[in-house]
């Protein structure tokens, strides 16, 4: 066994404008090819768009959207005796939040082309805050899969 102590989890840093960790997590997930300033610009434009459309605090809309998309359980593929099973497992809150952010960004990227990413992201966040949209559908689909495969929960 290793004698080294386990490394402490580094807490996520907060972004410069909203001073929020969620926004920074979103920026780091939207980041492509190391262009962080572009990622920040996309997020801040999306937040500004949310502010104009809903006249609410964009941070509260973001929190509500992520809370709505965050899954409680997920399915993991497990191979037992030559056959594979989708085994439902509970996931930790940090992992669930990361999944929610990934689903939100994936759903906003899949929105019809023609508008920029900030526009698509803002509409996906507003939809998720209102409990509809593709990211919410993805969460419900995952929960349905977990419910359907509940019989295999003992394979953990």
UniProtKB/Swiss-Prot annotation:
Keywords from the UniProt entry: Chloroplast, Plastid, Ribonucleoprotein, Ribosomal protein, RNA-binding, rRNA-binding
GO cellular component assignments: chloroplast; small ribosomal subunit
Cell inner membrane found in the keyword field: no
Localisation per UniProt entry: Plastid, Chloroplast
Assembly information from the UniProt record: Part of the 30S ribosomal subunit.
HAMAP family: Ribosomal_uS7_B
Protein name: Small ribosomal subunit protein uS7c
């Amino acid at each position: 066994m290793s004698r080294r102590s386990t490394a402490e989890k580094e807490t996520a840093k907060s972004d410069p404008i909203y001073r929020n960790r969620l926004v920074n997590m979103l920026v780091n997930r939207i980041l492509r090819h190391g262009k962080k300033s572009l990622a920040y610009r996309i997020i801040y434009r999306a937040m500004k768009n949310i502010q104009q459309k809903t006249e609410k605090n964009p941070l509260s809309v973001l929190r509500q959207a992520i809370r709505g998309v965050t899954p409680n359980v997920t399915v993991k593929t497990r191979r037992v005796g030559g056959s594979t099973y989708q085994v439902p497992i509970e996931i930790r809150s940090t992992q669930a939040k990361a999944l929610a952010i990934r689903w939100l960004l994936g759903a906003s990227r899949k929105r019809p082309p023609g508008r920029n990413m900030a526009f698509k992201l803002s509409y996906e966040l507003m939809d998720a805050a209102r409990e509809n949209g593709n990211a919410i559908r993805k969460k419900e689909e995952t929960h349905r899969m977990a419910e359907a495969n509940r019989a295999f929960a003992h394979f953990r």
